Structures are given as structure tokens and as C-alpha cells.
A protein has these predicted regions:
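A short acidic, often aromatic-flanked loop/helix-cap motif at beta-alpha or helix-coil junctions
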Residues: 64-67, 112, 197-199
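Short internal beta-strands
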Residues: 29-36, 107, 267, 283
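Short acidic donor-binding/metal-coordinating loop in glycosyltransferase active sites
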Residues: 87
Length: 306
């Protein structure tokens, strides 16, 4: 999912770009945690870091057991000042957060906090409580998946404790459990409200965020034979479209061919061949070959429908 292209850039590339742009300190090293060895994924991550002249390393979470467990897979990098960002989120914020605390947790007000980890603050923004996906509404400040720690070893020790003692929340090892324990031991965390948040955690939120980014960036519209393009849309280089209606809210990756189709509110990745399709609220991977009429689909890489 983090390597899905949104208006021409992968989610992970956008995250790296935003951190580089908005941080007052130079990012010297990025550690990526992925589920399994994958040459294609690792190559893409390497290219992104090389573009920004950042060193990187890759760690593997072969057996997903929650957010804290994932972070601990890169425990040897948890030293000194550490910024942790979950790769299913984009944001607009600076990183000039207060440095007089042991850590900062980035938050955004949401309508439905039950889908997120949340924090409860005092009047000075100091965090009083961390709760993972609360069943009752104790706060509408959702944790957006960005955390700063002044010393990463504090987090490593806290996660090691919950792993050793098998302290699971909702069946998984959660970072909120580690944070709550750290707070109870006297460490102080501040909440830091971000300006904008684009959530990519589910297909629905991914498409909603895709729509917002297209509207914000307003890409230049290209013209094609017998085709109507309704903005906002992003169409990459090498795309061929004929006899189709595209948009609004569509991204099309490079070298994709589309004929006799109607596509809206949809992400189409690169090197696809699509004929006679009617797509709405859909996500198509790379190298998809499609020649059939479905209305609401999520298709992975190299799929064929004829």
C-alpha cells in the first residue's frame, strides 16, 4: 500500500519528501520495516532514499503482531532522537515541536475516534492517557501515526517489556501500550496537532485522501482522442486513452492504455491495459489487464480479467 502512486508519487515518497521539507534537522537515516523480503519493494525504497541522499536500512516483520512489535524489529536503530512514521498516512505539519519533553505524539481531531488510538490531554497539551481504539468516547484526538522520541532506547526498553510480559491489547502488541507504560513511569509526552491529515489505512480512506490530494495539487489536464477528461485527474507520461470518459478524481500511472472505458474516483497504477471498463471507487495495481464490466473493484498487480 505505501508504494501505491497517488498523483504520480508513491505514498512513501511523499512521506520522505514532507519530512525533508518540514524538518529543521537533517534526516540522516531512514529504517523501513516491511513484512517479507521483496526485491522490487526494496529497490523502490532504495531509489527513493538515493534521490534525497539519505542512508537507509530495511528490516522485516515476518510475523505481524502489532505496531510495537513492528517497531521493535528495528530495535538496533532505536537510539538517540527518533521520529517514527506509519506509512499509511500523509500529513501537513512542521517538525518544530517542543523539545522540553521526552516525546511528542502527533494528533488530529476526528469525528469517529473509535477507529484510532487516541490521547487524553491536560490543558497544557501534556498527555494524561493513551487508549487504543476506545469503545467509549474519551477524546477525539486521534494519533495519526507520527511519534518523536528524544531518546529511542526508552521506547526500545518499553516495547521489550510488553513483549516479554505478553501485554497485548486487542490481540496485538500496540505502541500505545508502551507509551502508557512509559508515561506511568514518569516520562512526559506532549501532543502536537497537525494541520492536515490524509489517512490511507483502508481502501475508502485511501480514495478519499487521493481525492483531496488531486484537488489540492490540481494537475495539468492532457487531451486524448474521443475522450472527455473531468478534473481533477493525474495522467502520467506514456498513457494512451481513446474513446473514454475519465474523471473526476482519477490517477493513471505511466504506460497504461485505456479504451472505451468510463473511470471515476479511481487509482490505476502503471503498465495496465483496460478495455470496456466502468470503474468507480476502485484501485488497480500495476500490470493489470482488464476487459470486462465490474463497478467497484480492488485489483492487485499482474491480474487479468477478460
Amino acid at each position: 500500500k505505501p508504494l501505491i502512486e497517488i498523483a504520480g508519487k508513491t505514498i512513501i515518497q511523499r512521506i520522505v519528501e514532507l519530512v525533508q521539507k518540514n524538518s529543521s534537522k537533517k534526516i540522516s537515516h531512514i529504517s523501513f520495516i516491511i513484512t517479507n523480503e521483496d526485491n522490487s519493494t526494496e529497490k523502490q525504497l532504495s531509489i527513493i532514499c538515493a534521490h534525497y541522499n539519505i542512508k537507509h536500512s530495511i528490516y522485516y516483520q515476518h510475523d505481524p503482531q502489532g505496531t510495537a512489535h513492528a517497531i521493535y524489529c528495528a530495535k538496533d536503530r532505536l537510539t538517540g532522537p527518533v521520529l517514527i512514521i506509519f506509512a499509511d498516512t500523509l500529513f501537513e505539519t512542521d517538525f518544530n515541536f517542543p523539545l522540553n519533553a521526552d516525546g511528542c505524539v502527533f494528533v488530529k481531531e476526528v469525528d469517529d475516534p473509535s477507529a484510532y488510538g487516541v490521547v487524553k490531554n491536560d490543558h497544557k497539551g501534556r498527555i494524561l492517557e493513551f487508549v487504543e481504539k476506545p469503545s467509549i468516547n474519551i477524546s477525539n484526538l486521534a494519533i495519526v501515526g507520527i511519534y518523536y522520541f528524544s531518546e529511542g532506547t526508552m521506547l526500545a526498553n518499553a516495547i521489550n517489556y510488553i513483549l516479554t510480559n505478553k501485554l497485548k491489547d486487542k490481540g496485538e502488541y500496540q505502541i500505545t501500550t508502551a507509551l502508557e507504560n512509559m508515561k506511568n513511569e514518569g516520562l512526559q509526552f506532549l501532543s502536537f496537532k497537525i494541520n492536515k491529515w490524509f489517512d490511507f489505512g483502508t481502501p475508502k480512506t485511501l480514495l478519499d485522501s487521493h481525492h483531496k490530494i488531486l484537488k489540492q495539487e490540481n494537475p495539468t489536464i492532457k487531451s486524448f482522442v474521443d475522450t472527455i477528461i473531468t478534473p481533477p485527474c493525474y495522467i502520467a507520461d506514456g498513457v494512451k486513452i481513446e474513446g473514454s470518459k475519465i474523471g473526476p478524481n482519477v490517477s493513471i500511472g505511466k504506460n497504461t492504455n485505456i479504451t472505451s472505458s468510463e473511470i471515476k474516483n479511481t487509482i490505476v497504477q502503471s503498465n495496465c491495459n483496460i478495455k470496456g471498463a466502468h470503474f468507480n471507487n476502485s484501485i488497480l495495481g500495476n500490470f493489470v489487464e482488464y476487459d470486462r464490466d465490474f463497478k467497484d473493484v480492488n485489483i492487485g498487480d499482474y491480474s487479468k480479467f477478460k
